[in-house]
């Protein structure tokens, strides 16, 4: 009886923290170059795109254009953007610790607001696309997709990461 | 004995759980305290907005408005000893341009137009402004880079225009909007201040953003009116040079259409009928419909146009005028050879018929008398008459109402 009770208490103690933390989303580690390629391929109507990524020498500086989060917390990222100054943009940030995903999302929200303000002042017609932007967190990944083919691009992301 | 052991075990477990609970509570409290502190600090910062100033303001997060008075002072005094090499080169470039475009005896207004024309013709908008990670073209926000590379962002246009004005002893300020996303100029001509935004006119409209009043500018932007001087005079506004005399509501569609075709994207309509509150509202309602229709215009290369602003403004003669500004983006392609002469005549005829129908609906006589649009070939064959009034109901009531309101 005593052993059973102790076992029950111990099991409860083990399970409680899991319940408190909630269920974490299972995601795969992916090759970022491949992820970027697949997502860009899915965007059939994307204009000419340039890419900056964690592979660049000045990666921390480049990420600073879209996110003000501490680069030490980032394990990988890429930013693909229209070289002609259109709104089209794909950003994926993988953080080292899943708890920092929220911070990454908030930083991309700020970036999106900045882009909306910029286009409202300089190119309102093109800026309309920003209203349909997709910004989501999946596990330790955060992604922002601004494109006509946003659903197809998001699907390509999910197929690789989930 | 067995019972005692069980009790001790239970007490230990409860004690451990309580300790864990207390520990967790302390951790969460500390975390919450930190978060609240940060929030309070953030709110405190938000409550104390920075004081408005003309210079040392960063626009769109990247471009800084800097004073260029050292250069204009050196131009006026002829003493360049206080300038660095970059400033000397800027002065040299700016002086050469003024020598080229300014002639003796020009008024301040004529000088302003000369500079505006030169800038609109010779400078181009830097597309880097909208690129997420801009390529390093540099110096697009100051006269040195603008005059050297002829590529500018809004701050570059504004500071370069101000430099020219200050070199000629014309008062000028660089003004920015409340959100710090755009900047343009306030220039004082013959004792009155006006808004001039060359960035928005380059490659688009002729003088659409030239010498605007506060009322006109506030259609597009907001700014700190307690800091920047008020611009209320219509005297040197370009739209006032494009006055279209209208008899009543029925002249509005033709006036707008003709002005756009003539390339006057900023113009005013002056009415010979009484402009009372009811008439003013009805006129705005007509332009609302036009505004929606113009939004649908698109050029084959992706360009188009929209109504940038329209409102009643007090005229310097004590009356009111209706100001309209149309914004055009992209370039129209020359498709003049795409239609045969016969097709062109037929379509032109149909369009005039349609406009006459609109005029009729608004209370005009629909036969061209006094209207802005007259069918150039004088024909009234009615070929397109029915086809072009689909969806527009003939309503005696509405005609009657408009007759009483819109015409003299």
Regions found by a protein language model. Give the residues of each.
Chain A
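Short Gly/Thr-rich strand-loop-strand
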Residues: 98-137
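C-terminal motif of bacterial Sec signal peptides marking the signal peptidase cleavage site
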Residues: 17-20
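Short, compositionally biased low-complexity segments enriched in polar/charged residues
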Residues: 51-87, 99, 103, 130-131
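Bacterial N-terminal signal peptides that target proteins for export
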Residues: 1-9
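A short, solvent-exposed beta-edge/loop patch
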Residues: 125-162
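Extracytoplasmic/secreted envelope proteins and their assembly/folding machinery
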Residues: 32-36, 101, 105-109, 154, ...
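Second-shell loop/turn segments in exported
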Residues: 89-97, 141-146
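Bacterial signal peptide processing site
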Residues: 22-24
